[in-house]
Structures are given as structure tokens and as C-alpha cells.
Design a protein with these regions (language model features):
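Mature extracytoplasmic/periplasmic domains
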Residues: 453-465
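Formylglycine-dependent sulfatase
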Residues: 2-3, 10-12, 18-412, 420-441, ...
């Protein structure tokens, strides 16, 4: 209780100081595409070359317990920009679906309060076009650009230019979203060794124990790490420009990813390999004890209220997250006790939920009869096809076989500290019956409070689960079922549930 009161006091003190200041903080949110938390150097990766992100962490705050709401591109990004759970964003709980048009995006609130706002790179949330019967949103961004240029289709080619060309009489918010490291490895095709250094050597990459260690998997991983290095390079270019303009001191920089790596047993998973995101914050004017990491749990729905609060802007009542501004002043501050995540349609029929709390992860699976093989681009990958060949020869380890497991357990329970890869399911262990009951009750409470549901008719598979090939001819529309929460009108519910 004492820590909670202290956290509130720190938030209020920080907000009061900022709202009375003439210069509110600038904010840049860098979002990597398909990058796992432990593939960044400052998180202990021996393969990664991420010197710029590592320097930001060394002089800022590395968050070791930042959790996504979905390990899927558009649902995850939609949660960040609205501060809401995927099923509370309307159809946006599923890939390639728009956010309900009545829900405000937090950059719009910044724009309306005097910030210059820009989105450069991958959007992948929705346009400003309304759903049928809904109203049109006011413009969210002053400037939108693909971030691409000849020889660089990674979404970051015009980041520095955007910084340079902004109006200098306004604070700014930039949503800088890279396409790195999404397949099909554009960085390999346009590699500039003068900028990024040598490509990663396949012989030196770390192969996770749930992948098969062979030449094609190693090359796949090396190409993936090349794209992470390119993402890091362009972050460094933006930081250098801010330093040259003497604008770095009062710019809050945050670096994160939308979901885990695009490999088997990562992207779309409710396990840490899918939901645990890297999250690094750097803000010389606003972070005390720089270089001290934090173990405090945060959810990405907390980003919107945090940024708005620091800017002196009232968060919208639709936002379900909590400000973690207190952690910038005190790395031991506690903001939330629980983090909830979802697995909905992403190329394949799916419905799973999870809650993280006090060192445990509980996963429920409402479609246990089918495998969690990952998204179609991962299924088509050399890494997945290598596993498939080993499966057919009967040579998979239990960790490698998990990607093909069907039926799956309907309930999974893990100790995240002792079992970081979540391979030892404790759901049937009587020693953990009390923990399982407590987390199950939390998940039930959250489901009811937020209006979540398990529709009878979910969106069906669009791709073959073995090959990743499309089940319908090119140009045919994707078949859609009922979104989670639709029967409860969950896009109009604002209750956050347990936090």
C-alpha cells in the first residue's frame, strides 16, 4: 500500500512540474516489426548488434517486464495507440482490421493540445475512414509518410528528415515505425556495409532450443538480426540529429516492438517469446537514476496515458491503461500487478488469453484442437520447414515439437522466472493449484469487466497450416467470423478489469 501511495505521489509531482513548464517534452516512439525482447544487446543477446539502443538503455531506463496485449501486428499497435485491449477496439482485435472509429488515438489528443504529430513508416492499424454507421475521426497526424526510399524499404529512410523539417515552435510526437525485422528480409537485399557493418555470420547466431540447428535456420536467424541492426542504425541517426539540434535533453525516446520474432513458437504466441517486448526509455531531463533497469510490470496500453500525462493532457476516458511515469523517477515503483494478453485471428482461427502476475503466466486456449503453428509467413520460413522435415523423420525434441502439438492443453501455467521459455506446464501440478485458481479467477474477472467473449463462429483459417500457402485465390476476400467481444459491444466498454 505504501509503495502504491508513493507511486501516485510521484506521478502527480512529475505531472505538476511538466504542466507548469513552458517546454513540454517531445516524444518519439520507435516501433520495431517482429523483434523479440531478448534479441537486443542490452537484454543479454550475444548475437545482436544494437549499439544505439544499448546506449539509450545505459543512459535511460530498460524495462524488463513490458508486456504486449497481442503478439500480432495490427492488434498490438492498435492497443498502443488507443490504450485499450484488442477486443475493446472493435474489429481491430484481428489482423488487418480497423479500430472502431469512435475511439480516440492518443496522438490526436496531443495534436489538439498543440503538439506537432507525425507517423513515419508502418501504419498497419487503420485509416481514418469510419466503420459503417460511425463518425469520422478528426485527423490524428499532421504528417504521414511511408518512410521508404530507393534502396531502403525499411520504413525509416525519412526519419531524420522528419525531425529536421518539423515546426520548431511546437513540441512534437513522432510515431517512427520500422518494417524491420518483418519477413522477407528486405535488409539483406539492400545491405549497406558502410552504414551497418558486416552482415551477421550464420555460424555465430544463437539458435533457440525450440528451433532445429541447421544451416538454413542459422541463415534465417542471421538475416533477421541484420534487420534489427538496420533498425538500430536509424535510431542512432535520429539521436544524433537531436543532439546536433540540442533537443535531446527534453525528448522522451521509447523503443519497443509490436510482437515477437517471426519464427516458430514466437510471433502470435501468448508465451514470453511472443508477448514480452523490449522496452527502452531515454529522457535525460526526466529519468532519475539513469542506467538502472526496472522489473516493474507494465502493459503497452499504459503508453498512451503515460505520454498524455507527461504532456499535461488529460487521458481519454476510453483508455484502460495506467501511467508508468513514476517508474522514470523510481525504478522500483509499482504501477500494476497484472498484465493481460490475447491471441485472436492472425492468418488462422484462434482464441487464447493470458494473465501475468507475480512471476506466473496462465494461458487459456479456447481452440485447443488445433496447433499454434504461428503466422503464415513463419510457416513458410526455412526455420519452420526445417522443423517440419525433422518431424516427419521423428527427430524433434519436445521443445521443437510444441509448434505442431494438437490437441494442445486448454490450460497452461508457468513460472516465468524459473522457466523463461515456458516449457514446463504446471497446470496439473497440485503444488500450484492455489496459484492456478487465483490466476483463473483474475482472468474471469477481466473477461467479464472488459466484455470479452468466445464467439461460436470465429474467423476461419486463411492459409494452410502445414505449408503456409493461401487457401483462397488471390483477390478473394478474407472470410471473417465474429470478433471477440462483439456480442457485448465491448468497443463501447471502458472498464479495465484488474490491474
Amino acid at each position: 500500500m505504501h509503495r502504491f501511495v508513493l507511486s501516485i505521489a510521484l506521478i502527480l509531482a512529475c505531472s505538476a512540474a511538466l504542466t507548469s513548464a513552458a517546454d513540454r517534452p517531445n516524444v518519439i516512439l520507435f516501433i520495431a516489426d517482429d523483434v523479440s525482447w531478448n534479441d537486443i544487446g542490452c537484454y543479454g543477446s550475444q548475437t545482436a548488434r544494437t549499439p544505439n539502443i544499448d546506449r539509450l538503455a545505459a543512459a535511460g531506463r530498460r524495462f524488463d517486464s513490458a508486456i504486449l496485449t497481442a503478439s500480432s501486428c495490427s492488434p498490438s499497435r492498435s492497443s498502443v495507440i488507443t490504450g485499450r485491449y484488442p477486443h475493446n477496439n472493435g474489429k481491430a482485435s484481428e489482423l488487418h482490421q480497423p479500430i472502431a472509429a469512435h475511439l480516440p488515438w492518443f496522438p490526436r489528443l496531443l495534436k489538439e493540445d498543440g503538439y506537432y504529430t507525425a507517423l513515419v513508416g508502418k501504419n498497419h492499424m487503420s485509416s481514418d475512414k469510419p466503420l459503417a454507421g460511425e463518425t469520422v475521426q478528426p485527423p490524428v497526424f499532421d504528417f504521414i509518410d511511408s518512410g521508404n526510399a530507393p534502396g531502403n524499404r525499411g520504413g525509416h529512410a525519412t526519419w531524420v528528415q522528419t525531425v529536421q523539417r518539423r515546426p520548431k515552435d511546437k513540441p512534437f510526437f513522432f510515431w517512427f515505425a520500422s518494417l524491420d525485422a518483418h519477413r522477407d528480409w528486405d535488409g539483406d537485399k539492400d545491405w549497406d556495409a558502410a552504414k551497418y557493418g558486416p552482415k551477421h555470420d550464420p555460424a555465430n547466431v544463437h539458435v533457440p532450443n525450440f528451433l532445429h540447428d541447421d544451416p538454413q535456420t542459422r541463415q534465417d536467424l542471421a538475416s533477421y538480426h541484420n534487420e534489427i541492426t538496420r533498425f538500430d542504425y536509424f535510431i542512432g541517426q535520429v539521436v544524433a540529429e537531436l543532439e546536433a539540434e540540442k533537443a535531446l535533453d527534453n525528448t522522451l525516446i521509447m523503443v519497443m516492438a509490436d510482437n515477437g520474432r517471426p519464427f516458430p513458437r514466437a510471433k502470435t504466441r501468448l508465451h514470453d517469446s511472443g508477448m514480452h517486448t523490449p522496452f527502452v526509455a531515454h529522457w535525460p531531463a526526466g529519468i532519475a537514476k539513469p542506467g538502472t533497469p526496472t522489473q516493474s510490470l507494465i502493459s503497452v496500453i499504459d503508453i498512451a496515458p503515460t505520454v498524455l500525462g507527461l504532456a499535461g493532457v488529460q487521458p481519454a476516458p476510453t483508455m484502460q491503461g495506467l501511467s508508468f511515469a513514476a517508474i522514470f523517477q523510481d525504478p522500483t515503483a509499482t504501477v500494476r500487478q497484472h498484465a493481460f494478453s490475447e491471441h485472436n485471428w492472425h492468418d488462422y482461427e484462434a482464441h487464447g488469453r493470458s494473465v501475468r502476475s507475480e512471476g506466473f503466466l496462465l494461458i487459456t486456449n479456447q481452440r485447443p484442437q488445433v496447433a499454434w503453428q504461428g503466422p503464415a509467413d513463419s510457416v513458410r520460413s526455412p526455420s519452420h520447414q526445417s522443423l517440419r522435415a525433422m518431424r516427419d523423420e521423428g527427430k524433434l525434441t519436445p521443445a521443437q515439437a510444441d509448434v505442431f502439438l494438437a490437441p494442445r492443453p486448454a490450460l497452461e501455467l508457468y513460472r516465468t522466472d524459473a522457466d523463461p521459455d515456458q516449457l514446463q506446464n504446471l497446470a496439473a501440478d497440485p503444488n500450484y493449484a492455489t496459484v492456478k485458481a487465483r490466476l483463473s479467477a483474475l482472468l474471469d474477472e477481466w473477461t467479464k469487466a472488459t466484455g470479452d467473449s468466445t464467439p461460436e463462429h470465429l474467423s476461419p483459417d486463411s492459409f494452410d497450416r502445414e505449408t503456409g500457402e493461401a487457401l483462397r485465390a488471390k483477390g478473394q476476400p478474407t472470410l471473417r467470423g465474429t470478433p471477440a467481444g462483439d456480442e457485448n459491444d465491448s468497443s463501447h466498454l471502458n472498464a479495465p478489469g484488474p490491474r
